[in-house]
Curated annotation (Swiss-Prot):
It is an enzyme of class 2 (transferase). It holds the Pfam family UDPGT. Its EC number is 2.4.1.-. Keywords: Glycosyltransferase, Transferase. The keyword Transferase applies. UDP-alpha-D-glucose binds at residues 291, 342-344, 359-367, 381-384. Belongs to the UDP-glycosyltransferase family. The keyword Transferase applies. One of its GO terms (molecular function) is UDP-glucosyltransferase activity. This is UDP-glycosyltransferase 89A2. Glucosyltransferase that glucosylates benzoates and benzoate derivatives in vitro.
């Protein structure tokens, strides 16, 4: 586990601890990093109230156990929405198509939150809320506290989203789209734009509320990013210019801080650990596509055949994916299929793992980068095409192996790319991945590391409000 330089707490003997309220968006990739930040604030002497709905309360259990006197859950009933079935309170229950209706549902919590704030004996001095909850900017103006937007995504993606929402007519009428205002002037096919952009614009009329919500983020008093200056300084400077101030805090990768919040976060199944221990350093390809995506039978067949042809050692984590009959027997000794939950970060950081075949979700990207693994990207939806562009073309720590949520890869080509990347042909990208790993680790561990200094700046900003 990476050692973390903790900053002095803000609590004094004669004053109450500062009280912050945190409002995560109920999707694993959004919620867990913000809870990691909450943990760091508690370590520095803050009291934190976390707004959740009943179906998401279980995510707070590790945090409540770690900080029983500092963390309070504020539970509001989940407001209904005609597009959501009863009981749906998290994106994992419906997939990325649930983002917009869940965003709409949570807007209905405005008045209950105001009532809670006004009746609290020690009301919070600031709000940290997810970037999908941009409407909380106006809420904070009404109750008179600053709002800090939390971004569990890259600066690159924020730049792309802002351009798209400010140029709706261009996006709807042009393909590919040339984002001239952005650093490096990237070009994207319409199908590779973030899913929330395409869904916002595919309705009979644009989802103006969601577009407004995102635009509100640029007006927030401050912004906190789970990224690193090492990874995308040009887009950091672009976003700061758009925001018009320096209250932008780049504090990640949060997965490198070693929060200890996720249950068994550092443990690996003994049988898997034994298999990894018996593998040569850097020889294993870890294959996982996140918590939401399940591959089709055709995709699984092609991936399995590609792995088989590559002759590469691998660990393939699956949920309900239909693994071909006989595959596990044919790769016995060289490959493992693991069903269910795996401590991804712990596996990636094992010395035997040298590559990561990933959907390129941002949290997985950060875990891969901080582990020094070469990423073999198969972006499918959401922000993943943007993230893959950053990894492959900007950072040089990844190669693309496939694109698209419905695409079936050519197994011969897939096997060839895997073998080449995990072998001699991947030495250059592996060296680059290790260089970036060292730099991002220094950002969160060294006294003058950029992320360490940004956390200190954030704490001081809270002390001023």
């Amino acid at each position: 586990m990476t050692e973390v330089l903790l900053l002095p707490g803000t609590k004094s003997e004669n004053s109450k601890p500062p009280h912050i309220v945190v409002f995560p968006f109920p999707a694993q990739g959004h919620l867990l990093p913000l809870l990691d930040l909450t943990h760091q604030l508690c370590l520095r002497g803050f009291n934190v109230s976390v707004i959740v709905t009943p179906g998401n309360l279980t995510y707070l259990s590790p945090l409540l156990s770690a900080h029983p006197s500092s963390v309070t859950s504020v539970v509001f009933p989940f407001p209904p929405h005609p597009s959501l079935s009863p009981g749906v309170e998290n994106v994992k229950d419906v997939g990325n198509s649930g983002n917009l209706p869940i965003m709409a549902s949570l807007r209905q919590l405005r008045e209950p939150i105001i009532n809670w704030f006004q009746s609290h004996p020690n009301p919070p001095i600031a709000l940290i809320s997810d970037f999908f909850l941009g409407w909380t900017h106006d809420l904070c103006n009404q109750i008179g506290i600053p709002r800090f937007a939390f971004f569990s995504i890259s600066f690159f993606l924020v730049s792309v989203l802002q351009f798209c929402f400010e140029n709706i007519d261009l996006i709807k009428s042009t393909d590919p789209i040339h984002l001239l205002d952005l650093p490096r002037a990237p070009i994207f096919k319409e199908e590779h734009l973030p899913s929330i952009v395409r869904r916002s614009l595919q309705t009979p009329s644009p989802d103006l509320e969601s577009i407004k919500d995102f635009s509100m983020n640029l007006l927030s008093y401050g912004s906190v990013f789970n990224s690193s200056e090492i990874l995308e300084d040009d887009y950091l400077q672009y976003v700061k210019q758009r925001m018009g101030h320096d209250r932008v805090y780049v504090i990640g990768p949060l997965c490198s801080i070693g929060s200890g919040l996720k249950s068994n976060s550092g443990s690996v199944d003994p049988s898997l650990l034994s298999w990894l221990d018996g593998s040569p350093n850097g020889s294993v390809l870890y294959v996982c596509f996140g918590s939401q995506k399940a591959l089709t039978k055709d995709q699984c067949d092609a991936l399995a055949l590609g792995l088989e042809k590559s002759m590469t050692r691998f660990v393939w984590v699956v949920k309900k994916d239909p693994i071909p009959d006989g595959f596990e027997d044919r790769v016995s000794g060289r490959g493992l299929v693991v069903r269910g939950w795996v401590s991804q970060l712990a596996v990636l950081r094992h010395v035997a793992v040298g590559g990561f075949l990933s959907h390129c979700g941002w949290n997985s990207v950060l875990e891969g980068i901080t582990s020094g693994a070469v990423i073999l990207g198969w972006p499918m939806e959401a922000d993943q095409f943007v993230n893959a562009r950053l990894l492959v073309e900007h950072l040089g720590v990844a190669v693309r192996v496939c694109e698209g949520g419905e695409t079936v890869p050519d197994s011969d080509e897939l096997g060839r790319v895997i073998a080449e990347t995990m072998g001699e042909g991947g030495r250059e990208v592996a060296a680059r991945a290790e260089e970036i790993r060292r730099k991002t680790e220094a950002a969160v561990t060294e006294a003058n590391g950029s992320s360490v200094e940004n956390v200190q700046r954030l704490v001081k900003e809270f002390e001023k409000v």
